């Protein structure tokens, strides 16, 4: 695909979840489908006619096993935060239909225990997880998502740590 063709593609609507524990650390999972040391927070597409908040709760459950009764919403981003995929990935991800994603992010306080996080879900996305200091989070994220993660951490900074 040419850069012009990629620029004409839409963004995929997506939600992201910052899951914060009582110590102010955030959940990150190591992706199963990457050969690199790629970490990220739970995120995923918004289904057609799905409310973004409900999509965030669904993605959190699908990726971590954490149910809605174990979280409390603290904040959400004002708008949608876009990022572009590297051009070489566009034809391979989402069958070349999107140039990247635009994400609505939610900050949830985790009310449960660590043993209630279960990566062995129907479609596992993470091989392992950890609680990470928000100040050190961005450095572990794949480079093309770092700008969005910086904006998310900045947006939620008053509530983190």
From Swiss-Prot:
For this entry, the protein name equals: RNA pyrophosphohydrolase
Q: Which GO terms describe its biological process?
A: nucleoside phosphate metabolic process; ribose phosphate metabolic process
**PROSITE patterns linked:** NUDIX (PS51462), NUDIX_BOX (PS00893)
Motif Nudix box, chain ranges: 44-65
Q: Which top-level group of life is the source organism from?
A: Bacteria
Protein function: Accelerates the degradation of transcripts by removing pyrophosphate from the 5'-end of triphosphorylated RNA, leading to a more labile monophosphorylated state that can stimulate subsequent ribonuclease cleavage.
Q: What Gene Ontology molecular function terms does this protein carry?
A: bis(5'-adenosyl)-pentaphosphatase activity; guanosine-3',5'-bis(diphosphate) 3'-diphosphatase activity
Q: Which NCBIfam families match?
A: PRK00714.1-4, PRK00714.1-5
Pfam hit, one = NUDIX
Q: Which HAMAP family match?
A: Nudix_RppH
List required co-factors: a divalent metal cation
Entry keywords, A to Z? Hydrolase
Q: Report the coiled-coil segments.
A: none
Nudix hydrolase domain segment(s)? 10-154
**Gene3D superfamilies with a match to the protein in the record:** Nucleoside Triphosphate Pyrophosphohydrolase
- InterPro entries, alphabetically? Nudix_hydrolase, NUDIX_hydrolase-like_dom_sf, NUDIX_hydrolase_CS, NUDIX_hydrolase_dom, RppH
Q: Which family does it belong to?
A: Belongs to the Nudix hydrolase family. RppH subfamily.
Which CDD domains does the protein's record reference? Answer: NUDIX_Ap4A_hydrolase_plant_like
What's the EC number here?
3.6.1.-
């Amino acid at each position: 695909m040419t850069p012009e063709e990629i620029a004409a593609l839409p963004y995929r609507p997506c939600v992201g979840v910052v899951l914060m524990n009582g110590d102010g650390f955030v959940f990150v999972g190591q992706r199963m489908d990457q050969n690199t040391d790629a970490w990220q927070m739970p995120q995923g597409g918004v289904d057609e006619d799905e409310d973004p908040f409900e999509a965030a709760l669904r993605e959190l459950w699908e990726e971590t096993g954490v149910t809605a009764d174990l979280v409390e919403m603290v904040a959400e981003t004002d708008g949608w935060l876009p990022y572009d995929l590297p051009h070489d990935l566009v034809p391979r991800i989402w069958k070349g239909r999107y140039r990247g994603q635009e994400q609505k992010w939610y900050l949830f306080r985790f009310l449960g225990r660590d043993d209630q996080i279960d990566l062995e879900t129907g479609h596992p996305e993470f091989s392992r997880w950890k609680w990470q200091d928000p100040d050190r989070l961005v450095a572990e994220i794949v480079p093309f998502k770092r700008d969005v993660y910086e904006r998310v951490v900045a947006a939620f900074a008053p509530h983190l740590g």
